[in-house]
Amino acid sequence: MLLVINNALKSKLNGFMSAIGHGLAIGLYALFSVIGLELLTHNYYNIFIILKILSIIFLFYIGMISITKNKKENLLVKDNNVKNYRIAFLEGFTIAILNPKIFIFFTAIYSQFLSLDNNIVLNFTLVSTAMIVDMMWYIILTILVTVLGFKNFFYRRIFLIRKIVGLLFILISVVLMINLLK
């Protein structure tokens, strides 16, 4: 989030390009997660079930980390005058693609949706939804920061935002575990 905000503060187009790059990387991770989980469901179903359980635990863990993290993130902008759109795109793409936790996150989420009788439409929907939602979130964030001047709003509330997201992950993990035990 901070990278997109920093790029958005350089220029609106920088923010948009960073958002698109990030979204494409998220789409790739989503695609690889779906392909990997499909292979597991068809060839190693017991491992798939174990992975579902581990994924639920991971979501709970992410929620706990988000809730207990106290450090405020720094929103300082470096090189504010640099307006290289290609670099903004590459920064957005790189920060997402180099984060292996994203793959684990998608594996955790998608393992709850996939089964032996999946079809290509569901898989396409999972991948495209992740990519589009990610891009749109960061595009909206860019608009909020550049047009409406919400940088200080996010900065002052990053602690609260992190807590809310953490609680949401914990709630999702509890619901998924209840559904798995049924």
For the regions a protein language model found, what residue spans apply to each?
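Functional transmembrane helices that embed catalytic/metal-coordinating motifs
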Residues: 1-6, 90-109, 132
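Small-residue-enriched transmembrane helix starts and helix-helix packing motifs
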Residues: 16-20, 80-98, 121-131
